Amino acid sequence: MKIKLKLISFIIFNSLAFSGTTGKLVGKIMDKDTGNPLIGCNVIIEDTYMGTSSNELGEYILLNIPPGNYNVRFEMIGYKRVINDGVTIISDKTITLNGELVSSVIEGEEVIVLAEKKLIQFDVTQSEAIISSEELDGMPVTEVEEVLRLQGGVTVDSDGGIHMRGGRTSEVSYMVDGVPMSDVYSGGIGVQIENDNIQELQVISGTFNAEYGRALTGVVNMVTKDGGNKFEGSIHTYAGDYQSGDNIYNNLEKFDIQDDYSFSANLSGPIIKDKVTFYSSGRVNQSNGWLNGLQTFTIYGDTIFSDLNDNLYLDGLETQKEPYYKGLNWYDSWSSQNKITFNVLKNTIFKINTIINSRKGQDYNHFLQFLENAQITNYNEGKFFGFNLTHSLSATSFIEAKISENNFNYESYLFEDPLDRRYITPDSLFLARQENRIPEHIIEQYGDQVQYYPAYSLFRAGVDNRRFKRKTKTRNVKLDYTSQINRFNQIKIGLDFSEHSLMLDNYSILDSTLTDQVYTPIIPEKGSFTRTSYTFKPTEFAIYAQDKIEYKDMIINFGLRYESFDPKAKIPNNIHEPYIKDPRNPALDTLSLDQLENISWGDISYTEVDSNGNQINYTYANYYDRFNDQPELSTKTGWWKNTTVKSLISPRAAVAYPISDKGVIHFAYGYFFKI
């Protein structure tokens, strides 16, 4: 016999966010007829290994529950079983679910309660949005960035960068499964996460608890999906094209369904039931873009329909090739995620997670829109490897150990070989015209197309000779201890260590000499002002402690965080001389590289005789006295000096107190630190 009731369960979301990946379920179970607490009532989350029983006060606590929707079962001998259908667990929140059991003489009777989440989260102490996987499925978006744009306090700049509360793009911290995922060079997401793989997306655009570091304006915490004991899968795809009735966009009149498409699929399920599960997904995504250029000229200054056989006429195959449109902001990408969860040992869960994505494409360059094959192509690749071990010490405490490595590689170039002979400057056509090296029939036939000045018009010859390469790697270790020490206090203590590696090489191909009409590509020397090149390996360390106090209707969060940053690098002793191979002071030109590295800025550089015949000695440092910003330079030795460690102690506090069933007072204070 089943009795179906629709009730509103008392679900309360507690605490300022802990950057974790699990939530907590608490409540009290009573005898409906007598009002007495039920001791030893079983509380079971169906289709999982999680459960507990009520104590002598009828109260229960379940920690470390992954976010999602669950059926929670209350059962006890002599009472009708109660199934709470659709209980939503949210990361870093406490869900209160109380129950009343009715006596029964018929074994197997049960009551089904449909849980409904309250619209007002009375105790949230910051601006926060929680988006579940079900909500993501219903959104007309395909990228995480598109989801973020829909949240309050978030704005997007012209380059697609995410800003929270008016801050910079680099002031947002991105996390995946509780570990940092930010690219420490740009501040953006280091490895792309697909919407299909997200179980829960948490966006905080306010104050943060002590567990959060490396953030000033916002935190984005993504919890990825796990496999279960049932095989599940899905396929998502779309195809289309860009169209516009505005004539400022070229070649958008025709519709081609293959111009923009995406295909993604995922599969999850058990490898060994109740012991080992998996989740696997993949996606391919391609777009030809919406900004097209009419490919009219070759990189050498000829039209693509030029007189190839030098007979002064356009004939044969020459007339069959015409200018054509080509997408100039296209991209081609793929991604994959694979996650295995082990629940083999008692009270211990071990997870292995890998995320890989690759993308290549071009950014629109207005000045090169008429040139065939002259734009650089961008190549980027992201890889994430994560290991997560969770061990329950008791029903009210557990520890987590997380180890991760995040790699992001980005390259941008036209030709793979930097000394490729096809490199040619945009001025080459202009120089050829000035030197009368363009055939007269080309000038007569195409007129103004070859009569141009490169500084004021679209390029009709040459290539983009920029080259950019960087590699970023972050290795992270996190250890956390969480304990519900009593009814009112949940403490969390942890440490966080990251080791970074940043390599960058940025330059443009140069001409070996400007005295001839032949362009011979060369690579600028490292250390010169025309080339930025470095490799740094800084480290970050943090420890924190926080307490969440839940007393009646009041929620208090208090925490303390210490964090330090060690650049492990060298910087110039003289702020006006950043380039050791290109000194600004002419007096330094005669010194060797070894002498520059060990220079004594107080040494005599040169001697002059004034109008009175007096000899005046000038030191190297005197050259910079006019700036009046380095009074101690003459006492310094060496071109470089070591950086220092930066550290900070950050207090965090927050209070939430409901004043009615429709209102709550929030207060929060924090001191935040980010390099």
Question: Locations of the language-model features?
Answer:
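Outer-membrane beta-barrel channels and translocator barrels
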Residues: 141, 272-274, 345-347, 394-396, ...
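Signature of Gram-negative outer-membrane beta-barrel scaffolds
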Residues: 323-327, 464, 473, 484, ...
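Periplasmic N-terminal accessory/gating domains of Gram-negative outer-membrane beta-barrel systems
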Residues: 80, 85-96, 110-210, 214-219, ...
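Hydrophobic, lipid-facing positions within transmembrane beta-strands of outer-membrane proteins
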Residues: 160, 218, 231, 261-265, ...
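Transmembrane beta-barrel strands of outer-membrane/channel proteins
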Residues: 115, 235-241, 280-286, 352-356, ...
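Periplasm-facing N-terminal accessory domains of Gram-negative outer-membrane beta-barrel systems
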Residues: 18-114, 119
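Transmembrane beta-barrel wall of Gram-negative outer-membrane proteins
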Residues: 256-360, 380-398, 651
